């Protein structure tokens, strides 16, 4: 029984564990009791917020231990600063203070190793990180239980730091008024369904809900259950199975697998990370909805995107909206460059690229994450420039690039893996561009649905492959010790590029399909379901929600039994826990 109330870093409260659902059942029982018996409507709301904040803090303690103190400090700090912003004659100074405090903590815990390594590389020194918080903790414990030579990243700090920054910024902009009760504000910051892995809930989206009475219709209950079951299926059947049975093996030892296997691992990793992250979000949305709270949508079938810009409008939407509202637009959006008049295309491209770099660093303190963010930024810029070109110019430039690559190959006989990959990619894009150009010439005189469908499918395929390739750097930098992340991540990425660029053997494709048939089938099934029309998906959600309660219970039991058949021996944590 004592284990329920003690922190165990090896057993955090995960949505896929029985312990979480036991915790939620107890919390929900208390929640229902409060909503039925706690006096007036205002008293019920106040009691509900305090109760759920206490439950959320317990949840975070079970997930991150003593780092609950960091969450408490951030809560108190931003609450007090938020009170001062509308009262002060210089509100911007208070906003700057809030942002500086929040980002200082984020930089300390997340980027200390990254910038220390840069400093050592530049100046040839051997500076080591020092955990000042562990040092202070040892002063109170008298037994030196905390390691001072290692900085541990608190779970979810990137998410709740961005939330409190949005709170101060929204007050400054006049979008919301400061929360007058510290406990209500603490509830907003720490609401447990989305605390450790999002979605990032901006203050203007959630604070008004603090004062709305609980309301849950029969249909909303069904929708909430649907999202929970949908998330569990995504996480356990798709994400975990693909990871354990194929993806992790390839990324751990890329040189033991052929170029095709490495390439297919990149494609399946795109499915894994989507199923994992959107699965968490689905469960969070469902759990929150059962308590009458609405969390923002975080994914909108991102692999239907026709270009990188559209992808980032559909993927991790809460982060994309945050970056747009608090980074891209303050930088000037598509209006200016360094405060001076500039072309719309140039300024928007610069700001987009810088925003993607920041987004890459938000995910992790490694050069691989910087490269990942930069690649996405470059992809967006190229696509913007491409779409701004005349159709004839597009084809001519693509033809010239292809001819140049072929001539360079003949003259240099290059054997660099990355060059090989670029050459293949250019040839494929040229072939697709040629087909598109012929179709465009024909379609300029007549409308053809088939040509339009092929054009759309080609754009979707190109975007999916491009995004999957950028994730080579994302995945290789994940789940690593921050002290050695740069070196290990770069080695993995380099090995995979070598294999994909040089060790390609078509003869192993069919044996591979036979050996990993369940992996291939799950990947294909996942993509087909993902590409289903949104209209159809909405219909089967509503159909599920409209079922009689006994049938919903039976469906839930069936899903749990099915998921149990796929569950792995070692529970896989959610990918975005590390961010």
Language-model features, listed with the residues they occupy:
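Membrane-embedded transmembrane alpha-helical bundles that form the catalytic cores
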Residues: 1-527, 531-578
